[in-house]
Amino acid sequence: MKSYSRTRCVLVCAAFIGLFSIFSFRLIYLQAIKHDEYAGLAAEKHVYKQIIHAERGTILDANNEVLAHNIPVETVVADATHLNSQKAIVDLVSAELKLPPAQIAEKLSSERRYIVIKREVPEAQAGVLREKLRAANLRGIYFEHDATRVYPNGSMLCHVIGFTDFDHRGIQGVEASMEEYLHGQDGFRFIEHNRAGQEIVPYRGQERPPRDGYQVHLTVDLSLQNIVENEIDAAMEEYSPQKATIILMRPQTGEILAMANRPDFDLNFRGEAKPEEMKNRAIIDMMEPGSTFKIVAAAAALNERKLRPDSTIFCENGLWNFGGAALHDHRAFSYLSVRDILVKSSNIGAAKLALSVGEQRFYEYIRRFGFGERTGIELPGEISGLIRPPQAWSKISITRIPMGHEVGVTPLQMTVAMAVIANGGKLVTPRIIKSINTPEGKTISSLSPVELRQVISPETASEIGDALRGVVSDRGTAAAAAVPGFTIAGKTGTAQKVDPRGGYEQGKYVVSFAGYLPAEHPEFVGLVVLDDAHTGKPELNYGGLIAGPIFSRVAEKAARYLDLEPHEEIRKAIPVERVEKTTPAERIRKTGPAERVALTNASRH
C-alpha cells in the first residue's frame, strides 16, 4: 500500500514537473524567442505611421508675385482594422463629406489599414466630422494634414506654370520641370492610439520632420504677361485664329518676360480642359515660319562676305524659273540691294542670297541659329523642329528654304533667332527660371545667362538690324508694327498652312511678326504668331497687316511699363500714358537717335 502511494506521488510530481516544464518552455518561447514578432503584431493594432506631408514650394514671378501656392486641407483616411461600427461610420461620413454611402462602404469592406476616403477636405469641414466621430465614439477614421494647389491667376501663364496630380507631383510646365525642387521631402511619425482610437501623445514614437519644397522664381514679369494676355485675347476676338502665340524675351540674357498661347485653360479647373487647350504651343507647335526666316539667308550671305548690304541682285521682275519650278514674288522687283531684299521681302532675292553661299554652308547657318535642336528652356515637352540635311533636299529646296518653306520651327526658336540679331550675333539659351530659394528666402541657385555661340559677327548683326529697321517703315512690309517714339526692327512672315495629309491647305495661312525694341539698344524681342486668322478678305491675310499691329500694341504698352525713353521730340508731340506697376521693378532708360516713325499702311507680306 505504501509502495502504491509512493508510486502515485512520484507520478503526480512528475506530471506537475512535466506540465510546469511545458508551460515554462512555452513562456520562454513566447517571451524570448517570439517576443519581437508578437510585440509587433500587438503594436500594429494600436500604432499607426502618420505621414507628415511636406509643403510644396511656391512659384513666383520675377517681382515676387505669387503664381502657385498651397491652401491647407485634410485627407480623410480609414483603418479597416480599427472600425467599431461600420454602418454608423458610413452614414456619418457620407453625410458630412457628401459622398455616396455605397462608395464608402465598398472602400471600408476591405481589411486594408490605409484607405483614402476623400482628399482636399477643407479644414473646417474636417473639424466638424472629427468632433462628430468623437462624440459618437466611432473609431477607425483619421485625418492627415495636407494642402491643395491654388493658382490665383487662373488661366494666365497656364502653359508655363503647369499643374500637379493628386499626389502633388508636377505633370506639366514648371510644376513638372522643377519637381525636384518644389516637392520637398515628406516626414512621418509613429503614433499610438487607445481603445477609443485617440492618440496617446506621451507614447508618440519615432518622428522625422518634413522638408518643405523650395520657392521657384520665374523670369516672367506678371505685368508684362498681363499686357500680352490682353492683346492675344483681343486678337482671338478680332481674327478667330485656330491658335495663337505671343512671346517677349530679353535678348541679352534669354529671360522670357512673357509667354502666352491660345487656346488656354484655367489651372484651377484643369479637369474641364481639353487636350488641345493644354499644349504649350510656343515650344511644341511646329510651323513653316515664312519670311521671318529670310534673316538667316541674308545673315549667311553678309557674314560670309559674299555680298555687302548695298550689293544689288536681279530679282527677275517677280518670276523666276529654277530647277524646273517657278518662284514668285508678291510684286515685280528688278534689282534690289541685300538690304531691300529684307525690306521688300523678296522671295527670289532671298533664294539668290542662299545660293551665293551654297547648300552646305547655308544649312550650317540654319543650325547655328538654333533651328533643328531644342532651345534648352526649362519646360517639358519641347520639340526640336524639323531641319533636313542637304542630302535630303530637292533641286529647288535651296530656293524654298530661305523663304521659310520646307522647314519646321517652333515659335520660341524663331524668337531666339531674332534675338541673335538683337544681341550682336550671339545665341543665348532662353530661360524661364530666375532663381531657386529656400522657404526662408535664401537663394540656393541663381541661374546666369548661357551664351551658346557667336552665330554671326557683330558687324553682320548690325547690318541685318539696319535692314530690319527699314522693314518697319513706309518702305517696308511692316509699317503697321511701328510704335510712336521708338525705332523698331523686325520681319514679317506669311506662310501657307501645311496640310498634315500633305501639301498645303488652300486659303489658310500662318501669319507672324518678329521684332525688337528699341532697335539701337534692344530691351526685348517679341514674336506674334496667328494660325489661320480670319479677315474676311484674303488680300488682307498677311503678317504685316495682322501680326504687325498686334506687336505694335504689345511693344508700346511694354515700353511704357518698362519706362523706356522715347525720342525727345516725338515724346513731346505724343504724350505717353504711364502704366502703373503692381510691384517695384528696375527701370531702364534708353535713348536712341531720331528716326522717322511710319504710320502708313504696310505692303502685303
Q: How does the language model describe each region?
A:
Residues 1-270, 281, 286, 358-372, ...:
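Periplasmic/cell-envelope proteins involved in peptidoglycan metabolism and beta-lactam response
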Residues 68, 194-207, 246-291, 296-533, ...:
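Beta-lactam-recognizing serine transpeptidase/beta-lactamase-like catalytic domain environment
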